[in-house]
């Protein structure tokens, strides 16, 4: 028998942004029950989370269970007791070999349980396991926790109620309609559930609510805002769009201010005229069926007028004091308790901008970029920080490069957002984000899987995007090793031991292009009479100048670099790993090498040569060979070995793209005909040196052994 299943959790209004993730979490928890079903549908409104499934069996399938009994060597009495417990005769028992010896065993049939009973035992636990960033007690401390108080639960398998209780709420077949327009109690079944809700002014489907809003505003030129649309979908159960207007005199305020007031504080869409300019209108959604007398529309207009009047007052009042004169006020605005004030942060940003190579205008923008935090407009509308500073700077006569840099310095705020439009803005934004990252990691505020209060992941992703997309030739190794005193708290009275000296900045990797021959390759010369030294002790490949100390910030940023190039730019994961293994301090250089790798990968010689490089690496690691000494020509045997050496001397220093077709057949022939681990120690050493030199030559572009090949 195939049965429909209806499960509804009725609650007080859930925050709109939590609903989609909660639904997906509910799906996962239901699937973990491993109850067969044909299809499952999840829906939600602010007051309910709903799972509907079709095709559940009335009873689970029978199964078998292996029961292990006494050892074969056990007394007959023990064997008979085990058989009696299983309801069979001793001769019906099987003997099974185990790691501990031979044991009697029995395969017994386990009847399938009623699906209704399984659901009754598990649904309460599923409700409490749904993840929300914050939860609350509503029955007293120590009781169940959920995002909002649970008011009713519907749980039905076919036409039968699945009985259970949670926090005093018993499951049943009664749901609730719209808070104002519908009945408080509505009897439902899985078959009529959706229509019964619709009869009581609840549109269950989010897609249907979305279309209802779109269709109702089809004749209005809205400023595109998909995120606001999603917010309104999950704020309402019966959305009905309305359009209002405001005094055109408010259009004298900057558009950014008006749009922010409407969008972030009132959940209104902005409306554009035929020329694409802001019109004195707005659109919003009410959670009722109609507004025939216009009461709701006029109420929204009245609220918006008050908001706009506040914004105009703040705009005019703030401009009586220049941004530069607000700089001392930043000393009273705390950035973070352990990292000082925003005045301290401003000084660090200015120093970093200079370190990055920013000129006078960039330093000027860095000096003023945080001053708008002391303005009344930003205190009231915090989403406008940065933007307001740029607008005030423009109104106060700052040059375009300065005010645009201030305006843009919080960008990019998402992967879809653009980076700052000019070089000064990129320097200021990069310095601001780097300062936040360095400071927070220095005082131990490192993001976890569920907590990132300072949005450090977004800051790190912004660092990567600004450097790569802004083509900034900077060394991250140098920027990630700042003077510790820059983020230290003010010293306490009395002597303090000096801070350790910072490590020297690492030089950026060489730009793509011709390079001098790799170490170990020399022109023909008289050979030393001394025999080749024995191979050095085993060590890592490629050889490193020394172990890098643990650096959580560097590792954190490396993850963001991988994410950017793999998920955002579409490079293969092994391409990213290969290029980063050769160095990633200079992200512009890393991008160029990744483009070259992707181009090379399309050639027929690439994968076989990459497989050969992997083979070379494995040989060197197994031999414990880390380089040293020159290639001795007198020890090279005529044939494939000498030909590989001669080919290499001709192509050394050239980009791999131009030589791959010549190099690959020589490498293949070498491995087919030459025994690397020759019995003669000198010959073996010389062949390892040849392979090491060959691999090192091309490892400045990538560690090709990281490439996954079909070979």
Label each region the model flagged.
Residues 1-516, 521-711:
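Amphipathic alpha-helical "coupling" segments that flank catalytic cores
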């Amino acid at each position: 028998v195939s049965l429909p299943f209806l499960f509804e959790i009725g609650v007080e209004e859930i925050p709109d942004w939590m609903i989609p993730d909660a639904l997906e979490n509910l799906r996962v928890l239901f699937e973990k029950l491993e109850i067969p079903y044909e299809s499952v549908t999840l829906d939600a409104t602010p007051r309910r989370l709903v799972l509907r499934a079709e095709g559940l069996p009335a009873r689970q399938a029978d199964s078998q269970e292996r029961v292990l009994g006494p050892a074969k060597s056990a007394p007959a009495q023990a064997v008979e007791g085990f058989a009696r417990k299983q309801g069979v005769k001793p001769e019906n028992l099987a003997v099974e070999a185990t790691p501990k010896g031979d044991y009697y065993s029995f395969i017994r049939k386990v009847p399938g349980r009623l699906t209704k009973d399984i659901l009754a035992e598990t649904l309460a636990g599923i409700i409490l396991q749904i993840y929300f960033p914050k939860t609350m007690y509503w029955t007293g401390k120590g009781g169940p926790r959920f995002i909002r108080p649970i008011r009713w639960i519907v749980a039905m398998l076919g036409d039968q109620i699945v009985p259970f209780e949670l926090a005093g709420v018993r499951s049943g077949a009664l749901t609730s309609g719209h808070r104002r327009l519908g009945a408080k109690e509505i009897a439902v079944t899985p078959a009529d559930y959706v229509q019964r809700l619709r009869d009581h002014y609840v549109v269950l489907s989010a897609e249907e609510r979305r279309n209802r809003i779109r269709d109702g505003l089809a004749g209005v030129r809205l400023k595109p805002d998909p995120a606001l649309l999603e917010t309104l979908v999950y704020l309402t159960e019966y959305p009905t769009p309305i359009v209002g207007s405001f005094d055109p005199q408010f259009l004298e305020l900057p558009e950014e201010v008006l749009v922010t007031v409407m969008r972030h504080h009132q959940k209104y869409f902005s409306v554009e005229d035929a020329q694409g300019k802001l019109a004195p209108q707005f659109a919003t959604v009410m959670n009722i069926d109609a507004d025939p007398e216009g009461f709701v529309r006029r109420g929204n207009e009245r609220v918006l007028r008050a908001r706009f009047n506040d914004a105009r007052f703040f705009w005019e009042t703030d401009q009586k004091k220049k941004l530069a004169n607000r700089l001392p006020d930043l000393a009273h605005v705390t950035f973070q308790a352990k990292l000082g004030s925003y005045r301290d942060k401003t000084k660090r940003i200015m120093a970093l901008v200079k370190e990055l190579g920013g000129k006078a205008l960039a330093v000027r923008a860095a000096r003023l970029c945080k001053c708008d935090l002391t303005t009344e407009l930003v205190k009231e509308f915090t989403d406008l920080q940065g933007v307001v500073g740029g607008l005030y700077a423009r109104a106060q006569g700052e040059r375009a490069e300065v005010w645009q840099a201030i305006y843009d310095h919080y960008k990019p705020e998402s992967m879809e957002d653009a980076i700052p439009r000019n070089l000064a803005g990129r320097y200021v934004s990069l310095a601001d984000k780097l300062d936040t990252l360095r400071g927070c990691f220095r005082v131990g505020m490192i993001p976890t899987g569920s907590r990132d209060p300072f949005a450090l992941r977004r800051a790190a992703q912004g660092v990567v995007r600004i450097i790569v997309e802004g083509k900034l030739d900077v060394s991250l190794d140098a920027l990630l090793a700042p003077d510790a005193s820059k983020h230290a708290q003010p010293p306490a009275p009395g002597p303090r031991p000096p801070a350790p000296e910072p490590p020297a900045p690492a030089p950026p990797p060489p730009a793509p292009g011709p390079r001098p021959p790799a170490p170990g390759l020399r022109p023909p010369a008289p050979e030393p009479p001394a025999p080749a030294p024995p191979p050095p002790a085993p060590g890592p490949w490629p050889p490193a100048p020394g172990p890098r100390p643990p650096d959580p910030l560097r590792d954190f940023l490396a993850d963001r670099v991988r994410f950017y190039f793999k998920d955002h730019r579409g490079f293969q994961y092994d391409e990213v790993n290969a290029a980063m293994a050769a160095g990633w301090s200079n992200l512009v250089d890393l991008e160029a090498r990744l483009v070259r790798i992707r181009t090379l990968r399309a050639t027929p010689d690439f994968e076989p040569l990459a497989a050969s490089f992997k083979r070379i690496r494995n040989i060197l690691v197994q031999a414990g060979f880390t380089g040293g000494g020159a290639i001795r020509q007198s020890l090279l045997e005529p044939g494939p070995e000498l030909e590989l050496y001669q080919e290499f001397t001709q192509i050394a220093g050239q980009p791999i793209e131009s030589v791959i077709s010549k190099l690959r057949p020589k490498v293949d022939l070498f491995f087919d005909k030459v025994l690397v681990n020759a019995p003669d120690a000198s010959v073996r050493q010389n062949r390892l040196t040849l392979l090491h030199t060959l691999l090192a030559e091309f490892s400045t572009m990538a560690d090709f052994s990281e490439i996954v090949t079909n070979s």
